Amino acid sequence: MNINVADLLNGNYILLLFVVLALGLCLGKLRLGSVQLGNSIGVLVVSLLLGQQHFSINTDALNLGFMLFIFCVGVEAGPNFFSIFFRDGKNYLMLALVMVGSALLIALGLGKLFGWDIGLTVGMLAGSMTSTPVLVGAGDTLRHSGIASTQLSSALDNLSLGYALTYLIGLVSLIVGARYLPKLQHQDLQTSAQQIARERGLDTDANRKVYLPVIRAYRVGPELVAWTDGKNLRELGIYRQTGCYIERIRRNGILANPDGDAVLQMGDEIALVGYPDAHARLDPSFRNGKEVFDRDLLDMRIVTEEIVVKNHNAVGRRLAQLKLTDHGCFLNRVIRSQIEMPIDDNVVLNKGDVLQVSGDARRVKTIADRIGFISIHSQVTDLLAFCAFFIIGLMIGMITFQFSNFSFGIGNAAGLLFAGIMLGFLRANHPTFGYIPQGALNMVKEFGLMVFMAGVGLSAGSGISNGLGAVGGQMLIAGLVVSLVPVVICFLFGAYVLRMNRALLFGAMMGARTCAPAMEIISDTARSNIPALGYAGTYAIANVLLTLAGTLIVIIWPGLG
């Protein structure tokens, strides 16, 4: 039996789509030196090559892909978006505005200088900024702009062409810039990180190992009684000295949970909870042959839970004010916008932050009720909320504003982004509403993006050869300028206007570019995860601004002449 592969793919859009995705994902795993191509560029390259052979898919698949992607971007940004917008994230908001605004203005200027159309200009902006939200926002606005079908087809083709030609330029140049810009500016990020660590009491070890606390029990003998000298537990300050916490006392056969006024007596059996190194710091009078192995005394259920910060008595407060250790709980991690933060007593908690806490199950539950709620460890997505807010986003996107003879619509991209932000925000405030496991959210977002990239590549592939020959050199120059000049402007603004700590500033700059690989370079240079504070501060707002930038550039382009 002979199978004509070309006819088979042309006759089955679904098969063609998944062939493009599979081949593109394989290509995306390749590395050029230390830089991995990535899934987006892999799928785009394969789809462009197949598009040259006149393969195509239904545009409905492309539209659904971008809708899923942009909605999930909003859901991820939602928990922290409003706290960054309205509170102490003013500096981060301003940095993101400077980064996105300067890139937008430079792209507009270069587009007019080289005589490009709107498609090439926006594609170059999206690729140079390695920002798919720009591409998605612009593509949706173009489709609803009312321009002639031939112009629309050309603009959409050039959109993906500009993105494909400048994406690697933007990615590689930013990674190189992240490595060498601190040196060119004579900035010692390691010293800056250590400086802010001393000021705030941060843990500067980016690779800090996390252990579960362990339970050990000891019998109080004459040496320990002499060591306590009649002081109560509060006066002894065992936790302050060692990091261990007395969880239980058995006295005369009765188990009890002690308070700070308890005084140790001869014959007491005490259960201490702490990390392994904390037990090693105990005074020798605890350990000298007096360890007790008793099921009832040691029978505590130590759990590790992820607590989502929600309640007003925790939001806006410093981490130290929670006094977790006073309640027998141990903090392992602080996570904001999926970025692990340094454990810093002076970190101000935002709504939606996640604290990974270990301790006795009862105590952890008490802490969770006080500051928020325990993240649901369910693998079931609230599909009803997902679909309802998706519908709301589409309806918002249908709104059109009319000014005299000029009209413009909000568009699906902005509508879905707003609806996603609201769903994410409500999820951070109501533990049983709108739950989407992070793995499921990542999968839907990535799948939507890959479908969108496959669609734009297949539709633009037939004209890539002519386009490359006509604008290839110009694209190289423009890509480098748009990728690096806004970073330099952002650095100057943050350093000399906002006067930010350099380690935080460089992290915030990478967050404003939404570039995780460059963030890793900055953390390695600083030998600290302190820059993650800055990255998390700008990342969520930058994703939103970049989507709006793609919409805005299409709206204002006709008025520039």
Curated annotation (Swiss-Prot):
Looking at the UniProt entry, the stretches that span the membrane are 8-28, 32-52, 66-86, 94-114, 158-178, 383-403, 406-426, 447-467, 475-495, 540-560
Q: Which Pfam families match?
A: Asp-Al_Ex, TrkA_C
Q: Where on the tree of life does the source sit, at the highest rank? A: Bacteria
Query: What is the membrane topology here?
Result: Multi-pass membrane protein
- Provide this UniProt record's keywords sorted from A to Z: Cell membrane, Membrane, Repeat, Transmembrane, Transmembrane helix, Transport
Q: Which terms in the GO cellular component ontology are assigned?
A: plasma membrane
| Residue ranges constituting the RCK C-terminal domain according to the UniProt record | 200-288, 292-373
- SUPFAM superfamilies associated with the record: TrkA C-terminal domain-like
Q: Name one GO molecular function term.
A: monoatomic cation transmembrane transporter activity
Q: Where in the cell is it found?
A: Cell membrane
| Principal localisation | membrane
Q: Which PROSITE patterns match?
A: RCK_C (PS51202)
Q: Name one GO biological process term.
A: potassium ion transport
NCBIfam families listed in its UniProt record: PRK04972.1, YidE_YbjL_dupl
> What family, per the record?
Belongs to the AAE transporter (TC 2.A.81) family. YbjL subfamily.
This protein is called what? Putative transport protein YbjL
Highest classification ranks of the organism:
Bacteria, Pseudomonadati, Pseudomonadota, Gammaproteobacteria, Enterobacterales
